[in-house]
Amino acid sequence: MQWADVVNDPTLRNLPYKIELNQYGQIVMTPHWPIHSEIQSLLQDALNDRLAGGRAVQEYAIQTTAGVRVADVVWRSEERWSEIRAAGAVPAPVAPEICIEVQSSSNTEAEMAEKRALYFEAGALEVWLYDESGRLRFFDPDGERAQSKLVPSFPLRVDI
């Protein structure tokens, strides 16, 4: 199955799940809690308030070497958006500069490490992890950082 098949399948619309494709073209569905969406909105708003020259967006489908992954929140520059639009592809053939995952208790550290690696391989400059305590962890391709290089004013905690 290809991402275009998923997007165009009417039976997969309006499901209470985040849908991704693994490297074998199989659908992977993850349940979404309302608080997850609230956190995504807070992060999106905070990014848009602090970073000019682009836009924060939720639920961003990114083509990776292990299938399609959907980042919870991303920030992409206008230049990156032009590159994504010019490719005319669904999903995005290159990752936005910042990819954020909102972790839940069902996410393992190994799963998050894999997603970070996939986003970096696809072109992300930073990957952020938001944990259930409200703490943010910032990563660049070299490892974990004390704060974001791209948005140094971003808080280390975002409470709901």
Feature locations, PLM:
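Gly/Pro/Ser/Thr-rich low-complexity, intrinsically disordered segments predominantly at protein N-termini
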Residues: 1-160
